[in-house]
Structure formats: C-alpha cells, structure tokens
Amino acid sequence: MKRIFLKIAVYCLSAVVMGSCVYDFVPDSSDLQGIEKPLVVIEGDIIVGGMTSVALKSTSPVLGGIEQDGISYAGASVWVENEEGAIWQGEPSQESGVHVVDTRGLSQEGRYRLCVSVPDRGEYRSAFKQVMVSPPIDNVSYEKADDNSCVQFEVSTHNSASAPLYCRWTFTEDWESNSELTAEIRAKYKEGKVYMEDIPEEEREEASRCYSHGNSTGIYIGSTEKLSQNVIDRERLHTINATDKRISSLYCMNISQTAMDKEAYKYWEVTKSSISGTGGLFAPMPSEIRGNITSVTFPDEKVIGYVNVSTESVKRVFVYAHELNMFKRNCNGVLYPEEEEGDNVWFSLYFSGLVPIRYELKENGDPDKSQAYWTSPDCVDCRIFSNSSRPAYWPEGR
C-alpha cells in the first residue's frame, strides 16, 4: 500500500483556543483507510457555567509530494445539546475556524454533547457525557532552578470526594515585553548622508513599553488515581528560561482547570505519551481511545478529537521580575564616533542594521553629537516582538 505522509496542523488544547502545533508522522496500515482525504479535527470542551470555545481544524494530506488542501469550514455551525433536545447555538468568532457557545446557563445535572455541521462533509457529534465538577485551584506556585537558569510553574488542587480526581490544565500568558534600552535618537539617511534626529517622548514610550500574549501549547494533565490522598500537589505546568523576555518585567498566567472522567484522562494520557514518544499526535493508538466524536453522515469516517464536559476553575497569578531576580539582560550599547580615519562610521552602522541609542555626554553634561551609542533594533523597540495590547486587567501604573 502506498505510504501517505500527513502534515498535521491542529490546536493542541481546548477551552481557551490554544496555539497550533505541527507534527509529521506516518500512520500505520490500519490508519491509511480513507486517509487520502483530510480528517476533521474538533478541539474544545463543553464548559458548564462558562463560555465554550471550539476550534475546527483538519489534517492536510501530502500526496506525491504535494500538500493537499485542508477542509473549508465556511458555513459550518456548532452547537451544544442535551439529552432532552435543547440546543445552545454557537457563533463564529473573529478567529478563523473558531466558534463560541454561551454555555453559562447549563445545569450541572444534565448530560451534554457537542454537534458540528460542515457543508459537504455532514454532521459530527460527540458522545453525551455527564458534567464533571472541577474543584478549586488551591495554588499556583513557582520554583527557580538551583542554577538560576529557569523558573518552573506548578499547580496544586485537591478533591474532598473519595473518587479519584482527573484534571487537565490550559493557560494563557500575558506579559510586558518591554525593550531593554530606550532610544533617544534615531538615524536617517538622505542624499548619501546619515544624520540624527531626536525621538519625541511619546514615541519613546510606545517603543519601550509593550505587551504580548501567548497560549499554552502542551498537554497538561494530572491524576490522583495512584495516590494515597486525593491531592495533586505542585504538578508542573511549564518552564521559562532566565533569558526569556516573559519574565523581564511583569508576567501573568491565567490558568484554567477542568475535571474529567477516567476515559477522557486515558485519551489525553496516551495522546501526550504518543506525541512525546513518537513525535506525532496520530501515532498508532488503541481504537477504544481514539476519541468520542463520530460522523453521523458517514459512520465509518475517522474524526480526531475528544469533547469533555466540565465546570471550570480559574486562577490568575502575577510575577514581577524583582521577585524572581533572574532575568539575564543581553542588550548593550557600543560607542562609535561619527567618523574615524576619514571613514563615515555611522554610515556603515546604519546600513548594517544597527540603530543609535543616545549621544555620548561631555564632561559638562551636554551631548557630544559626534559620538553615539549603537545597538540592535530589538533592544530599543519592543514593538518588533510584541503581539498584543495592554490587558484590561493589568495593574494600574504599569
């Protein structure tokens, strides 16, 4: 049988839509049936008492060295329904392929499923599931490595019930992605010459204070099944290196916790193990844990995804750079004269991609406009690497 390679672009985490991950893999022979067409990927849990976000993605088959088109979800509809037939209709969000369903009014006593209708593909449904109640997040802590090379973030929770606790976590991040240096001047080129001009104070502020946003891209799960107590203590979420700009000023993590049953936990456990062990989200898995979504229109069609039904516990934590005292700054300015031995040094620096920061100062404090400090652009303009605006919840004065 012809070997078919797939490039998978899927959203790795649900509830809050996560950043995409791409994996290359070779399916086993049983997975090749019908794989010439892209597979539907449905990602998102039903959040009882909150907003449900569902990402519609697809695999992209690569046949004969040519990557085939994925599935178009134009005109798709998403809804949640209970066993009595009541429907909560979703709406497309601003992000392509993402639909949002208002499930704040759902009762914890009901059983619910997710339904998706895709033009030219048919209807897809997850299995009805009861609502799992997530306990509160007890604490989000962090611990610095002994060599100060990184900081590790951890989450703790517990359940007073006797049944084992199965949890999954996702998180979003916001941080001040400020520039390490502030430029007071900039270089301009005109008629074969490089000259300097002052940067207005307002523009200096815009270039020196920025904000960025990120989403978790891993699978974070925990269980008390094999523990003597129903306590998940300091389960590691992720690690940030000491040179990462996320911890250069003020960092915030918004953590979402959902509870799940053993079946859902097993799905994510094997998926996580498969990714780390073979490099592919769709490495061979036992058929009984492929997911809980089926095609109503074509029952034999393979669908990727697992829809859990749970309440959501959230916690937000702020970490200031001075609390960690570990961010390693890499930016410095180097002093260069305008001319040296008849050569225009600034001309060469300008066309090398470097930028000026400020003039050297004379003994009396006045600027020496024949000498200036230069550095790389990303050291003085945080807009180069920022991707967001100031969050509404950000502390005043920041």
Question: Predicted regions: what is each one?
Answer:
Residues V17-S20:
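C-terminal motif of bacterial Sec signal peptides marking the signal peptidase cleavage site
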